[in-house]
């Protein structure tokens, strides 16, 4: 397989430090049978990347893959990365992150500390090495400006694991102050293992209206991520 060039360009005039990038990449028919055969390179240096098969050719080879990774760019910088097929891929290499599950929480270890997800709750806590934990949550207010309560259906579910990130999802419903259901929600946390960055995506669904999706990225040292009013 020929190298596939991925060109990244910073156009907003701001330096980017370890920002998440996700994109789909098409592959030629019959060239790649499994994702472990692929590597993402920055010159001669490999980049930690999490690859997920999206589609296959009729012969079973990969047709599309989704790549997730972190990248740093200076203001106005253009950077070319290359997706290559490894000559000697190692199918047995393990990239399983350290995850500890207890009755009251799920803890994901990162290179900078840990992220603890509270069971049956839309709360999590980020702890960095030699620093106290930072509690985080998502809040919602109703049309009167009153805070709603997040009632989870069950505990957080780990949906993706790999060398780049761990993803966890929590589903439930928002309740008004009188316990009347307001809307459904689904929250996904994408925890990047190299930096402790957490990417938050929240979808709310009011059966009487359309779905609404919001997302933000927070560092381990930043304040909790909060979303605005439901109208």
Predicted regions and their residues:
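P-loop NTPase switch/coupling surface
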Residues: 128-134, 224-231
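Acidic, contiguous internal or C-terminal segments within carbohydrate-active enzymes
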Residues: 158-230
């Amino acid at each position: 397989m020929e190298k596939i060039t991925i060109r990244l360009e910073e156009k907003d005039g701001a330096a980017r430090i370890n920002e998440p990038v996700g994109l789909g990449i098409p592959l030629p028919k019959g060239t790649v049978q499994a994702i472990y055969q692929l590597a993402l390179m920055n010159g001669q240096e490999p980049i930690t990347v999490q690859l997920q098969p999206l589609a296959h050719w009729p012969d079973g080879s990969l047709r599309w893959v989704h790549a997730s990774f972190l990248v740093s760019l200076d203001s106005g910088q253009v950077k070319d990365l290359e997706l290559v097929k490894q000559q000697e891929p190692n199918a047995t290499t393990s990239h399983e992150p350290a995850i500890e599950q207890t009755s009251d929480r799920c803890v994901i270890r990162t290179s900078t500390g840990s992220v603890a997800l509270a069971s049956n709750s839309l709360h999590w806590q980020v702890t960095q090495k030699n620093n106290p934990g930072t509690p985080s949550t998502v809040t919602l207010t109703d049309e009167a400006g009153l805070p709603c309560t997040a009632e989870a259906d069950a505990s957080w579910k780990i949906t993706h694991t790999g060398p780049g990130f761990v993803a966890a999802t929590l589903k439930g419903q928002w309740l008004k102050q009188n316990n009347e259901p307001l809307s459904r929600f689904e929250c996904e946390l994408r925890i990047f293992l190299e930096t402790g960055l957490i990417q938050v995506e929240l979808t709310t669904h009011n059966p009487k209206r359309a779905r609404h999706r919001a997302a933000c990225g927070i560092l381990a040292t930043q304040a909790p991520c909060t979303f605005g009013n439901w109208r």
